[in-house]
A protein has these predicted regions:
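Alpha-helical transmembrane segments and adjacent TM-loop junctions that form the membrane-embedded core
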Residues: 1-91
């Protein structure tokens, strides 16, 4: 059966939070949006990352996280991870 299993939004948020928090470059999860698009759940995450990361690194990390989330939650139609460099410096 190709029926998409129903996963509660709470469970999605929990799993996504875990995946994002495990990544060393993620500073803070700013937004987690779960919407339905053409009957597919669509997830958008906005996270702050270290300001020292290059744009290329941000893209690589975002793709990596999107893949991880898609693997963990097969029922999601689309996963988008947006990384925003955080202005705060550590020093």
């Amino acid at each position: 059966g190709a029926i998409a299993e129903q996963v509660s939004p709470e469970e999605v948020r929990l799993k996504v939070n875990l995946i994002l928090q495990q990544h060393r470059n993620i500073r803070k999860i700013l937004k987690l949006d779960l919407t339905r698009e053409a009957n597919f759940p669509t997830l958008t995450c906005v996270c702050s990352v270290d300001a020292s990361l290059t744009i290329r690194e941000c893209h690589q990390i975002a793709s990596q996280l999107e893949n991880q989330i898609e693997k963990a939650l097969h029922h999601l139609g689309r996963v988008t991870v947006i990384l925003k460099p955080s202005k705060q410096n550590r020093n």
